[in-house]
């Protein structure tokens, strides 16, 4: 018969049943549980109890399996528990979790492993007298403390409520008493890990064991896992006996297959048989035997001297405790609680019946998902076991909840009545960052979604801002509302702008309609201006309904409409920079009517943009002497006076009559349908008064033009030399009147009758949203007032495209916009004419719109007067407003929009003595 028998619960071989189920068979139950690092998961290897290595006999390990071991001549039953703390079992469970995806993170998997182990440990505490906790290292795993503490809570709160009732109802386990267990089991801690102490140095090993015992005892007492009353403790610790053992036996981690290979190699390296001594040969052969006496005769086995048991082994320590259990039982209580502890050693048959019942209560039923407990206390145990054991999940849930609370408070701090989605996202990100400082574990994503939903609910429940964009791109600051009219919106942004004449500055609300931006504000501020309502002005074409039944025009193919209308119109589609529209018989300057003596081909109305830029560069690069000569030739023009246009030309010049039932919904631009006019003008042209208002020595006075930055309130002089041809009668009349006023004889003035010089003052004014105004002296140069102001000429702004947007000189680097053109006309028998065109680029100059005033002919300005042309504040294309750039610099200003060159011209006027 094998000295050590074993079987796996619940299958008991008949031969073993006959031995164990004897009526007088009493045994001390020793549970072996903990961790193992070998593939068989067998933790009894280091006990020196097994005659054969488990790797040669045991099958594959399985989580939850309980194997019984006992000696035929002994009275100790060893229960070997295979749990999730065994390395091989844990690896299999991990692979299964990865394949199924049940545990999607480490914390959940670790929680599962701890919960399964704790359930088996609690069951062992109920059915064992002693428990050996095996640790494959030399260090105590302090994570056991949380498991012990949780099991103590579970036992006191749930187990002691339902288990006595169930035991009584089942008529099994009467020997367990009111504590529903054999006794308070005594724990032995076995460490199989190697340490620096050699096995021969027994004293040092024992000193180490004593030190570890003291540390473990303190930790268990501190956590109240053991108390003075062992009956109220989860388990007990012996008061005067060892309960910690450091194993120095290398067999615990040996592999028989590898050992056999090593011995075979050693045997092959030895001398031939017969050449070594009999004693050495016998020792080597004993190593090869799988168990003692294997392959030897019975006489040989019995003939040897009895082998004495090793003095230092964990099995020896266990048997000492077993002897105490049989003699006195375990009473590890302190002082007044001694003698009150329950200790029972029932017959094996009675114990086994109770074991099966408790196994069903603690192991089988929790694994059965369809099991419905009848007892309320037992049901509470099943529902709350994992919650109590799983301190990691509780910890992570608590820190997530704490972080969640702080994040919620952070989000709600200093919230305005209404706020935008951008502000909401910013506040949420701040709250999220605070949450992530505290939150840890698998619940982070779940709580993060809850935080997102919470913040969104606050924002959407009465805090959401309208955010409808203004024409300047600013969102509406009001709460979410349904607006029937864009005027119902308000961004709360206030700008500073000057009126049409520039005399008065006022605050304006951020516009939401083109009418509000380009018309209504200027009508409103005109009431506060002492000038605007009294000034002479040019009226631009607007829609005039013939009845109350009118509507906005709807058109699909604008290009087709334009091509059809161009045949009956003298307006040309936008192809770049256009000259003022003239003909050979027109009495004003055309694009080709230049002096033959002029070296350049530049005119007021420039035919070619590249030609304009070439001459502008040449002009800028010449010296002072050449500059004067070039300037004289550049600004010399020829006016040919012909007969009035005949009837045919007049008919040709007549445009299609505008519609009186449909109006243009947007702003006029070069490709707008012919015959449609807007409801209001986006441009303004007013006469500020006589030319004497402006004095070039002092510039624009503050009381006439407010808000100009220092040194930039000067207009630019533009000297134009005019030569008359084929107009003797016109020139003679002009000279006669002029000489009569000057008392000069006609003969003296005849030589100069065909030549005279005009001085025109031009100012291209920019205005930022804070009301800062300044004049520019060139496409990329801001006018700087000073002693050199006379040297700056208006030619640069006349013959070059001027940017619509330019950086302001103020601290905030705001974007200034071209808002006004100042023209001081000369006192001469000619009229300055204007045909302004503003080209706005979009999508990196991939598309553009050229906006016009809608006048069929260039605008004629009166002589000797100060005129101000106010440009639109906002430009709107066919698909909506054209947003100004958020930032701009001098190098890329022209990429966003330009005021096309060629907007100025000269036309003859009637001669009168009042003029001269």
UniProtKB/Swiss-Prot annotation:
UniProt keyword annotations, A-Z: Nonsense-mediated mRNA decay
Region (Disordered) residue spans: 566-626
GO biological process: one example: nuclear-transcribed mRNA catabolic process, nonsense-mediated decay
Keyword hit for Membrane: no
Domain of life: Eukaryota
InterPro entries on file: SMG8-like
Compositional bias ranges of the Polar residues kind: 589-604
A matching Pfam family: Smg8_Smg9
Function: Involved in nonsense-mediated decay (NMD) of mRNAs containing premature stop codons. Probable component of kinase complex containing SMG1 and recruited to stalled ribosomes.
Family membership: Belongs to the SMG8 family.
Protein name per the record: Nonsense-mediated mRNA decay factor SMG8
Native organism: Aedes aegypti
Lineage per the UniProt record: Eukaryota, Metazoa, Ecdysozoa, Arthropoda, Hexapoda
